[in-house]
């Protein structure tokens, strides 16, 4: 059993990033192997880690166990029996009056995530920072923060007791102003979250709601997203200084969420004690409503105004919600004034989001706004190859090119198609070939081919530029007609399976060289002209529905 685990750990260490290996694999330990039942039990130090490893790595570990013992092995994950002894404080829940109000936007965390009192959170964070900075002053910092924690807990106990039942599901792990400032002052560049104990690292992920798998290392970069990635890295290296706020926009499944999680994960690794929060805009709206109903706005504001990095996803969901927008405006102003970083995503350019207050739009425009475009062919192929590699599947490049050529809209669609191919191949016991891929994706390819036609592209483009559809076929050459016609040709080449001669025929019998010239011209200008790039983005999203 131990020989297997050494073999398994060595393989996983080579396959995963150092951060992933140290965080998820290193804390595991094999505890039993039942040869009669072919069952292997692996212990995890806590429930959070157990659930994550089970969902992400159980299949790979089972495959390695099968190869090692030359038979199917049932891999079971259990809690380390010693875990309870390492955390005695968690055994006795605090009385209701001493529990903190709960965090807005708790997204599936364990039930015990908010079990520590508010001030203890500040003490832990500052103590982590003090230890990472060196032993000098660590004891004093801890003593001072413990005193502050006790005072804060006593001061707020009566007020919170009355509201404890009503605000329990807000889960606000807040600090008072002094604690937040103390935690912020104790940061040192280069302090790594990974150097803390495993329990502390888990707690950071639970509080921040970050997905530790979404990092810069596994983000596939191409022309469509290279500017966004460069801006994200710059912000991760200089939070609150470079590009504040950073506003990323683009269609569904293009990597916006991946990038902002990558920023959060990088900062969490670089600065111990960083107060980071990822939240979807819908959850933020829900928490504003709960805070209003439970009269818990003081806790709500204290929590959000003391963050060091706020990552808010899909802010278009704020549309028409004036109270939410007002609260977010105040939080935004407080964070920027404190040199905290704000990062926002949307499916639309800021000025085109309907129902958003002009004050917020102007704040969004005050930083850096970057579009993420649908991935180009080479990038789509790279995404498929990377995803197949992560699933430990050998994917022929011809198959990847076939899928990438036919599915153009976003990364999620590509990954979903690959999962479908893998399942089809496994179920039928057939090697993954182009023929198998066509069978697996038959319905999806039919829908794709039916969705966008050259005729629809011509009509949509003509409407967008206020010309007649007939102008698409005519021989007229004024700039206000020729330009939209070239754009429509470019979109026809990008969004359909038509050949250049076929496209030329549908544009009034034009030669294929005319179409090729238009495609190359628009593609070149798109990379240099932000306005044209934005117009094409709008047209593509309209055509894809």
Curated annotation (Swiss-Prot):
Chain intervals for the UniProt region annotation (Domain III, AAA+ region): 209-425
Keyword Oxidoreductase part of the UniProt annotation: no
Feature: compositional bias, Polar residues: 189-201
Annotated region (Domain II), positions in chain: 72-208
Main location: cytoplasm
Compartments it resides in: Cytoplasm
Keyword Lipoprotein attributed: no
UniProt superkingdom: Bacteria
Coiled-coil ranges per UniProt: none
Region (Domain I, interacts with DnaA modulators): 1-72
Segments traversing the membrane: none
GO annotation, biological process: DNA replication initiation; regulation of DNA replication
Listed GO MF terms: ATP binding; ATP hydrolysis activity; DNA replication origin binding; lipid binding
UniProt biased composition (Low complexity): 90-105
UniProt cross-references to Pfam families, sorted A to Z: Bac_DnaA, Bac_DnaA_C, DnaA_N
Record-listed ATP binding positions: 253, 255-257
CC per GO annotation: cytoplasm; plasma membrane
Region (Disordered): 90-112, 181-204
Quaternary structure (record): Oligomerizes as a right-handed, spiral filament on DNA at oriC.
Function: Plays an essential role in the initiation and regulation of chromosomal replication. ATP-DnaA binds to the origin of replication (oriC) to initiate formation of the DNA replication initiation complex once per cell cycle. Binds the DnaA box (a 9 base pair repeat at the origin) and separates the double-stranded (ds)DNA. Forms a right-handed helical filament on oriC DNA; dsDNA binds to the exterior of the filament while single-stranded (ss)DNA is stabiized in the filament's interior.
Family classification: Belongs to the DnaA family.
Entry comment, domain topic: Domain I is involved in oligomerization and binding regulators, domain II is flexibile and of varying length in different bacteria, domain III forms the AAA+ region, while domain IV binds dsDNA.
The protein's name in its UniProt record: Chromosomal replication initiator protein DnaA
């Amino acid at each position: 059993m131990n020989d297997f685990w050494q073999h398994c750990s060595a393989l996983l260490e080579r396959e995963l990033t150092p951060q992933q290996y140290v965080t998820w694999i290193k804390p595991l330990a094999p505890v039993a192997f039942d040869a009669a039942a072919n069952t292997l039990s692996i212990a995890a130090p806590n429930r959070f880690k157990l659930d994550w490893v089970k969902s992400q790595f159980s299949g790979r570990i089972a495959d390695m166990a099968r190869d090692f013992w030359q038979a199917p092995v049932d891999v079971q994950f259990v809690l380390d029996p010693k875990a309870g002894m390492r955390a005695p404080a968690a055994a006795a829940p605090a009385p209701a009056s001493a529990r903190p109000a709960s965090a807005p936007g708790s997204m599936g965390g364990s039930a015990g995530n908010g079990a520590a009192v508010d001030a203890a959170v500040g003490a832990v964070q500052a103590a982590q920072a003090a230890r990472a900075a060196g032993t000098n002053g660590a004891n004093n910092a801890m003593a001072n923060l413990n005193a502050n924690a006790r005072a804060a807990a006593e001061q707020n106990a009566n007020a919170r007791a009355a509201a404890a039942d009503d605000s329990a599901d807000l889960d606000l792990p807040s600090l008072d102003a002094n604690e937040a400032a103390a935690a912020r002052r104790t940061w040192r560049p280069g302090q790594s979250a990974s150097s803390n104990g495993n329990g502390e690292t888990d707690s950071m992920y639970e509080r921040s709601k970050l997905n530790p798998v979404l990092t810069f290392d596994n983000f596939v970069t191409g022309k469509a997203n290279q500017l966004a990635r460069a801006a994200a890295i710059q912000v991760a290296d200089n939070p609150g200084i470079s590009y504040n706020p950073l506003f990323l926009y683009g269609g569904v499944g293009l990597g916006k969420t991946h990038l902002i999680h990558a920023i959060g994960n990088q900062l969490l690794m670089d600065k111990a004690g960083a107060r980071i929060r990822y939240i979807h805009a819908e959850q933020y709206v829900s928490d504003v409503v709960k805070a209003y109903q439970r009269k818990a706005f003081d806790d709500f504001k204290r929590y959000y105004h003391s963050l060091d990095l706020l990552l808010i996803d899909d802010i278009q969901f704020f549309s028409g919600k004036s109270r939410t927008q007002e609260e977010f405006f105040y939080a935004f102003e407080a964070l920027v004034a404190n040199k905290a970083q704000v990062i926002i995503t949307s499916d639309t350019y800021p000025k085109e989001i309907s129902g958003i207050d002009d004050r917020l739009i102007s704040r969004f425009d005050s930083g850096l706004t970057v579009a993420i475009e649908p991935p180009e062919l080479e990038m789509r192929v790279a995404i498929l190859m990377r995803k197949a590699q992560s699933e430990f599947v050998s994917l022929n490049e011809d198959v990847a090119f076939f899928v990438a050529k036919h599915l153009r809209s976003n990364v999620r669609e590509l990954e979903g198609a690959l999962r479908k191919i893998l399942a089809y191949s496994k179920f039928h016991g057939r090697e993954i070939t182009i023929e198998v891929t066509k069978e697996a994706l038959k319905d999806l390819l039919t829908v794709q081919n039916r969705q966008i036609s050259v005729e629809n592209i011509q009509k949509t483009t003509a409407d967008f530029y206020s010309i007649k559809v007939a102008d698409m076929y005519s021989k007229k050459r004024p700039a206000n007609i020729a330009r939209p016609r070239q754009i429509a040709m470019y979109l026809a080449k990008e969004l359909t399976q038509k050949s250049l001669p076929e496209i030329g025929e549908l544009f009034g019998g034009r030669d294929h060289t005319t179409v090729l010239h238009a495609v190359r011209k628009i593609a070149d200008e798109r990379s240099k002209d932000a306005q044209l790039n934005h117009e094409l983005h709008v047209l593509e999203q309209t055509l894809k529905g």
